[in-house]
Amino acid sequence: MDMKLLAAGIAVLAGIGAGIGIGIATAGALEATARQPEASDKIQSLFIMGAGLSEATAIYGLVVSIILLFVA
């Protein structure tokens, strides 16, 4: 097996962490909205910002894996 493929596969694992993180954050946001519906606007904006930051790690992993496959 080529080491580039192994390294790219390991870099893609960042997507798993991002998926788990966004899932946990979504569950927390839904629970918080259910407890305090009047604060749903603030909860939603904070959730979207946090989900974007969490998704950035998955995008970085994808970029690294593409670089490893095609450049390295």
UniProtKB/Swiss-Prot annotation:
SUPFAM superfamilies: F1F0 ATP synthase subunit C. It is found in: Cell membrane. InterPro entries: ATP_synth_csu_bac/chlpt, ATP_synth_F0_csu, ATP_synth_F0_csu_DDCD_BS, ATP_synth_F0_csu_sf, ATPase_proteolipid_c-like_dom, F/V-ATP_Csub_sf. The keyword Ion transport applies. The record marks E55 as: Reversibly protonated during proton transport. GO terms for molecular function: lipid binding; proton-transporting ATP synthase activity, rotational mechanism. Pfam families: ATP-synt_C (PF00137). The chain crosses the membrane at residues 5-25, 51-71. Keywords: ATP synthesis, Cell membrane, CF(0), Hydrogen ion transport, Ion transport, Lipid-binding, Membrane, Transmembrane, Transmembrane helix, Transport. GO terms for cellular component: plasma membrane; proton-transporting ATP synthase complex; proton-transporting two-sector ATPase complex, proton-transporting domain. It is a multi-pass membrane protein. NCBIfam families: ATP_synt_c (TIGR01260). Belongs to the ATPase C chain family. F(1)F(0) ATP synthase produces ATP from ADP in the presence of a proton or sodium gradient. F-type ATPases consist of two structural domains, F(1) containing the extramembraneous catalytic core and F(0) containing the membrane proton channel, linked together by a central stalk and a peripheral stalk. During catalysis, ATP synthesis in the catalytic domain of F(1) is coupled via a rotary mechanism of the central stalk subunits to proton translocation. F-type ATPases have 2 components, F(1) - the catalytic core - and F(0) - the membrane proton channel. F(1) has five subunits: alpha(3), beta(3), gamma(1), delta(1), epsilon(1). F(0) has three main subunits: a(1), b(2) and c(10-14). The alpha and beta chains form an alternating ring which encloses part of the gamma chain. F(1) is attached to F(0) by a central stalk formed by the gamma and epsilon chains, while a peripheral stalk is formed by the delta and b chains. This is ATP synthase subunit c. It comes from Clostridium perfringens (strain 13 / Type A). The lineage of its organism: Bacteria, Bacillati, Bacillota, Clostridia, Eubacteriales. The gene is atpE.
